A protein has these predicted regions:
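Long, leucine/valine-rich, helix-dominated scaffolding and oligomerization segments
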Residues: 1-186
């Protein structure tokens, strides 16, 4: 678990510091290569989500969990700043007409959105086990990052709900946007 958290942080640092410098050259080349570079972070966070479901995994790596809480906090800030720029549905023609630079930008936003939503689950799993965690972990979550306070605007904004181009409500579930015809089904 600690190795995955370390890999996640290294990937985030690469994405934040190196990717902006190489994205234009990546756009000129093979698009699958650039997508896989961006998707690595999503793969690692997915593995961590599965592991964090289990109390033993959280308890085993309490020192690294502090770094994971900081990571999730940064993703929550990104999600709050997203506003109306959340991933939109595109027609096939729109996707074909995109330049490589626009395609990379769209993929980047979609992947980052998915990662941020997964971070909500991870924080929930950590929160469920607060009584079993040491004081520095609880302090990081409740005092330093003030996770409960940052979740309130996210719950009010509901970035996991969008209206598609047809005016229908969609909810982000299971790593994809799903149409919800019944208003009762929308959280």
């Amino acid at each position: 678990v600690e190795t995955l958290i370390y890999d996640l942080l290294v990937t985030e640092a690469w994405k934040d510091n190196i990717f902006p410098r190489v994205k234009n050259s990546l756009a000129k080349g093979f698009s699958l290569k650039s997508y896989m570079l961006m998707y690595h972070e999503a793969t690692v966070i997915n593995l961590l989500e599965i592991l964090m479901f289990h109390r033993e995994a959280i308890e085993e790596c309490q020192d690294s969990v502090i770094e994971l809480i900081d990571y999730c906090y940064r993703k929550f800030i990104w999600l709050m700043n997203l506003g109306d720029a959340k991933p939109k549905d595109h027609t096939g023609k729109e996707l074909l007409d995109q330049s490589r630079e626009d395609e990379i930008k769209r993929q980047h936003v979609e992947i980052q959105f998915s990662i941020a939503i997964i971070c909500i689950s991870i924080i929930r799993f950590i929160s469920d086990n607060l009584s079993n965690l040491n004081i520095p972990v609880v302090h990081q979550m409740m005092e330093v990052n003030d996770i409960p306070c940052i979740l309130i605007p996210l719950l009010e904004e509901k970035p996991w709900i969008r209206t598609n181009s047809k005016g229908e409500k969609e909810v982000y579930e299971d790593q994809k946007w799903q149409l919800k015809k019944d208003a009762q089904q929308v959280p």
